[in-house]
Amino acid sequence: MSFPIWFISTACTQLGIALIYAFTWQVFREKATWAKVLVVTGVGFMAAGLVGMVHALVTAPPSADSALVTRGPIFIGMVGYAGCFLWTALEGFHHHRMALRRLALGLTDPIVANRFFLWGLFGLMASSLTAISAVTALLGGRPSGTPITMLPMGVLGAAAATAMYLAFFSPAWYVGWLQSQAPKDSLGGSKDRARPRSARPQVSCVHASRAFM
């Protein structure tokens, strides 16, 4: 891969993860000072890793193994990646647990409650995938260089993508299944099942999460 293409792809990846940091902060901990510090710290680790990788590649001799000369900076950047996904998992599962309590009392929508779980599941799968990549890089290997790493990373990536799809683009069959599992007196229960999906009140993840805090 050419250096410009590598740099652009890595920068875009880091931008995407920075936006996930921002999303988790704004949705779950908008007013928490520690959350702002966490976002800045995580983005700082990613930026430091990128700068370190660029420096290592530019100054390394042509015959050097890129995986070896960049393993330190890659690991630093992966710390920022892992912080984002682990925080995402913790917030998702924490608010899912709180949502289940409200769901039992008929105070929330089963679809919203499930989205918290899916968001947490995405974070857990992505955290595990990042951990594999970080350890492999630290040992001087390439995550894509062996089936031992590619197979679990592929499974984890597919699980993370599925969780994101179900959370943000829930198909009708999945929504119906969630409603069938919900307590009868909850939002989305028997009363909502009699109404067309388009006529049901839409509860945003942002508003729901704030109500649970």
Task: Give each language-model segment a name.
Residues 1-56, 71-85, 145-157:
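Individual alpha-helical transmembrane segments in multi-pass integral membrane proteins
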Residues 1, 58-73, 102-110:
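Juxtamembrane/interface segments of multi-pass membrane proteins
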Residues 51-63, 135-139:
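Membrane-helix interface motif
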Residues 35-41, 75-136:
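Alpha-helical transmembrane segments of multi-pass integral membrane proteins
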Residues 1, 30, 61, 109-110, ...:
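Intrinsic-disorder/low-complexity, polar/charged segments
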Residues 88-92, 113-212:
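C-terminal transmembrane-bundle signature of multipass membrane proteins
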Residues 24-29, 93-109, 174-183:
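Cytoplasmic membrane-interface regions of multi-pass membrane proteins
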Residues 55, 94-96, 207:
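Histidine (H) residue identity feature
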